[in-house]
């Protein structure tokens, strides 16, 4: 955070063991803004601070050597103007723009839970594709609950997203899953799965 304080960092870094036996930490970093035109605001919390944003992208990965603490900042989404601006301002902090994260690390990437939670919250309303339904809020979802005592009443504790093995393109991958119900009801209506392609 002291090296690049302009990014928001995920609270759940994870370790990866490379092919040569080294252990590295993978830390997801986000660019955010509250000035993106024609975009819905949402509230986030980081470092004990609450703020409203309408733009967030997981455009930077930080690879940290678990032994000596060496940090490497990679821009994984070169279409993000904010990340590219930071890279141009601080060229010595980031790896070369053409540098790729080693495959023995990138193949173990998982979908970042912080970004997923922001997306999952917005999907409760913005799953609608019909403008009239969207503006009338006729079809709003809720996060599924457990320990609910009534099938028609919104009680119980919200079921948080969880990592599990999912099958995609005939391949088993680690994915994040969030289950939805219609608002104030307890029957499953949809679920959101987050997986990564190994590049970002």
Q: Where are the language model's segments positioned?
A:
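Extended, regular secondary-structure scaffolds
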Residues: 1, 23-27, 41, 48-53, ...
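Exposed beta-strand-loop-beta-strand "reactive/processing" segments of non-cytosolic proteins
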Residues: 6-63, 136-184, 189
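Acidic/polar loop patches that form or flank catalytic/metal-binding clefts of enzymes
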Residues: 7-12, 71-74, 116-117, 200
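Accessory, solvent-exposed terminal regions and/or long lumenal/extracellular loops of proteins
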Residues: 82-200
């Amino acid at each position: 955070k002291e090296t690049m304080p302009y990014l928001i960092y995920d609270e759940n870094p994870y370790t990866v063991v490379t092919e040569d036996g080294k252990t590295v930490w993978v830390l997801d970093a986000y660019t955010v803004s509250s000035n993106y035109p024609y975009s819905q605001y949402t509230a986030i919390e980081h470092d004990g601070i609450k703020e409203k944003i309408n733009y967030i992208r997981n455009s930077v990965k930080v690879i940290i050597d678990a032994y000596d603490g060496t940090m490497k900042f990679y821009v994984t989404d070169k279409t993000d103007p904010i990340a590219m601006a930071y890279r141009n301002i601080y060229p010595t902090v980031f790896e070369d723009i053409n540098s790729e994260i080693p495959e023995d690390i990138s193949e173990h990437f998982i979908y970042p839970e912080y970004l997923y939670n922001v997306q999952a919250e917005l999907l409760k309303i913005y799953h609608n594709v019909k403008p009239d339904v969207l503006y009338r809020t006729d079809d709003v979802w809720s996060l599924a609950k457990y320990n609910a005592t009534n099938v028609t009443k919104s009680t119980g504790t919200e079921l948080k997203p969880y990592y599990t093995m999912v099958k995609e393109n005939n391949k088993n991958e680690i994915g994040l899953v969030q289950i939805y119900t219609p608002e104030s009801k307890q029957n499953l209506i949809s679920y959101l799965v987050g997986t990564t392609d190994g590049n970002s």
